[in-house]
Amino acid sequence: MIQMQTNLDVADNSGARRVMCIKVLGGSKRKYASVGDIIVVSVKEAIPRGRVKKGDVMKAVVVRTAKDIRRPDGSVIRFDSNAAVLVDNKREPIGTRIFGPVPRELRAKNHMKIISLAPEVL
């Protein structure tokens, strides 16, 4: 469950290391984002010579949350940290690699490029 001011790790090689959510997209009163939702983020920490710089405002897809994800079969999946992948306006990832596992709920939200780049889909 991601809301405004939430800090997230970046799970790609775009150059950003930490980002902060500044808006949850999808309605004027929407407060929370879950896995697969698109948020607007500000880059808080970046590596030198990366594609993005500190202070850049980007869109990102939430790929991991510490809050439980409930599945229709009754199982529950949760991660140790909150993580996102930076995307452009066409929802294509900015980085060329994804680090760490991603849940298969991303497939239902049509983030196929992220699924194909991920090393493991849970």
From Swiss-Prot:
InterPro entries: Ribosomal_uL14, Ribosomal_uL14_bac-type, Ribosomal_uL14_CS, Ribosomal_uL14_sf. One of its GO terms (biological process) is translation. GO terms for molecular function: large ribosomal subunit rRNA binding; structural constituent of ribosome. Disulfide bonds: none annotated. One of its GO terms (cellular component) is cytosolic large ribosomal subunit. Binds to 23S rRNA. Forms part of two intersubunit bridges in the 70S ribosome. NCBIfam families: rplN_bact. Part of the 50S ribosomal subunit. Forms a cluster with proteins L3 and L19. In the 70S ribosome, L14 and L19 interact and together make contacts with the 16S rRNA in bridges B5 and B8. HAMAP family: Ribosomal_uL14 (MF_01367). PANTHER family: 50S/60S RIBOSOMAL PROTEIN L14/L23, LARGE RIBOSOMAL SUBUNIT PROTEIN UL14M. Belongs to the universal ribosomal protein uL14 family. This is Large ribosomal subunit protein uL14. The gene is rplN.
